[in-house]
Amino acid sequence: MNAVEQRRAVSQLLVVRASGHAGDHQRRYPRWELSNGELQRLLAKGIGGVILLGGTATELQQRCRTLRSWAGHDDLLLCADVEEGVGQRFEGATWLVPPMALGRLQSNDPEKAMVLAERYGRCTADQARRCGLNWVLAPVCDVNSNPANPVINVRAWGQIPEAAGALAEAFQRGLQAGGVLGCAKHFPGHGDTAQDSHLELPVLRHSRERLEQIELRPFRRLIAAGVDSVMTAHLVVPAFDAEWPATLSPRVLTDLLRNSFDFQGLIVTDALVMEAITGLVGPGEAAVQAFEAGADLILMPADADKAIDAVCAALDSGRIPSLRLEQSLQRRRDALRRCSGAQARNEAASPPDAGETSDERQLALELVSATLERQGGTPIEPPAGGGVTLIRVDGVLACPFLRPDAPAIGWPTSCGFRPIICHDLGISPWHEPPQGDNPLDLDRLGDGPVLLQLFLRGNPFRAGRDRDEPWPAAIRQLLQLNRLVGMAVYGCPYRWESLRVLLPDTIPAAYSPGQMADAQQMLMGLLLGDEQTLGLGSEFTD
C-alpha cells in the first residue's frame, strides 16, 4: 500500500473519545472528548472507532448515526464503558446494579445469580444495539481479591476466581445473544492492586503460579467461551515483565495472551491518556509500543495525529513489520462481520425506541431486590422534633443518582430528617483537627436522631481517599450518644461489612451494591416503612 493508504489503514486501529451529546458545549470532559470539528476531520481520515460518554439514550442513538454519516460508512467500532448497563452512562436507558452484586448473590444462590448475569448481559446488549453501539467494553474479568482496591471494587463480578469467571462468562453469553461485541478486561488482572492506574502505575508482585490460580483464570474462561476482545491493564507484573506495563509489553500481550492463551480476537489497550502510561512515554511512542507489543486497537491516544504519525514511521522503518498491520486489520474486519450478522438477526425484534422496555425495567428492579441486604430492628419512627440524614457521597460533581427528588433525600425529608450532604468539595462532618474517638463535629449537624447514608464505592481518580474516613469511630460516637437510628450503605460491600457489625440488633440497617434511585427507594422502604411517601414539593427551591 502507498503512504496515503497506509495512513488510512493505521487510522482504522485508533478509537477516540467523544461525548454522547450533539453539541461541543455539552461535553463533560473536553480535555478528552474531541470537538465535532476534530471528530469529523479524523473520521474523514479513517479513524476506526469512537468511545462515547454522556447524554441520553436517544441522544446516543442520533449521535451514532451522525458519526457513521461523518465517516461515510458503517464499519465503525462504536463502544462505551457500560459495565452496569447502558443507563450507567446514558440517561433513559437501564442502570443495573454493579457486577459484584451478583458475586455476593452467587455465594447463596449460584443458579439464580447465573441466570441473572446472562439476562444482565442480554439487556445491556439489546439497549446498546438499539442506541447504535456495537461494542460493549465489558465484562470486567478482574478478581477483586484486594478490598482496598480503589478502582475495580464493585465493577468486578466477585473476589473468588471461579465465581467471577462463571458470572462474567454468563454475562458474555448475553452480549453474544444480543448481537454486540464484548471485551474481557483488564488483562492480566487489576483486582489485587491498591493503586489507581488512572493516576499512577501499579505493580502486581505475585508469582506466576499465584497469577495462574487467581488473576488469569477468568480470562482463560472467557477466551475459551469466544470473547471478542481483551483489554490490557496499565500495570507492571514482574512475573512476566519487570520493566514495562502489560499494555506495552510483548511478553504479556504476544507471548502470554496471543500465543500461550491462543487468543485470536482483538487486543485493545486501556485508555492511553491514563497517567500510568503518559508518565512513561509520549503519545506517539505509547501507540507504537502498544502496537509493537501486540495490541490491535489503540484506545484514547493522548494525541491521535501523533499516534498515527508514529505508527506509520515505525512501519516505514521496519521497526514494526507490515504483516502486523494486516493481521490487526483482519481481526477488526472479522469482529465487525460477527456483530453485523448478529445485529441483523436481532433487528426485527428491536423496538425503535432507544430507551428501556418494560422487561428491562423489571430486570433492573429484580436485580436490586435480589441483591439488597438488611439487618436490625423495626422501621424508624419519624422524629418528633426533627432529625438529620447525614449523606456522604464520593463525588458530587458526577453524581447522577442524588438529585433533589432522589429517594435518599426526599423520603427521609418527608419523615422529618433534614438532609446534610457531605462531599470532598463541600461540607465536612469531621472535627478539624481530628478528635480521635469523637470524629464527627456534631455542632455542624444540629440536634436530633441521625439516619446515616453512605454512597461509597471504588471510583477512578479518587486514589482511595474515602478509605481514610473514620466511619467506624463515627458510628460508635453516635451510638454512645444514642443518636443513630438507622444506616444505609450504597456501593462498597467492604464498607458495609465493616460497619454493620458495630450496630446493635435494635437499629435497622440495609445495603445495596447499587446507588441508583431504585436502590434508594427499596432501602428507604426497608428503613422508613413502606407506607411512607416521598412527599416532595415546596421544600426544594431554586
Can you say where each PLM-predicted feature lies in the sequence?
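Preference for extracellular/luminal or secreted protein segments
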Residues: 1-38, 46, 259, 281-542
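Short glycine-enriched loops at secondary-structure junctions
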Residues: 19, 80-92, 134-144, 184-190, ...
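Second-shell residues forming the walls of enzyme active-site clefts
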Residues: 3, 25-29, 50, 56-76, ...
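Alpha-helical scaffold segments that flank or form the walls of functional sites
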Residues: 108-133, 224, 286-292
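Catalytic domains of carbohydrate-active enzymes, especially glycoside hydrolases
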Residues: 35-53, 122-135
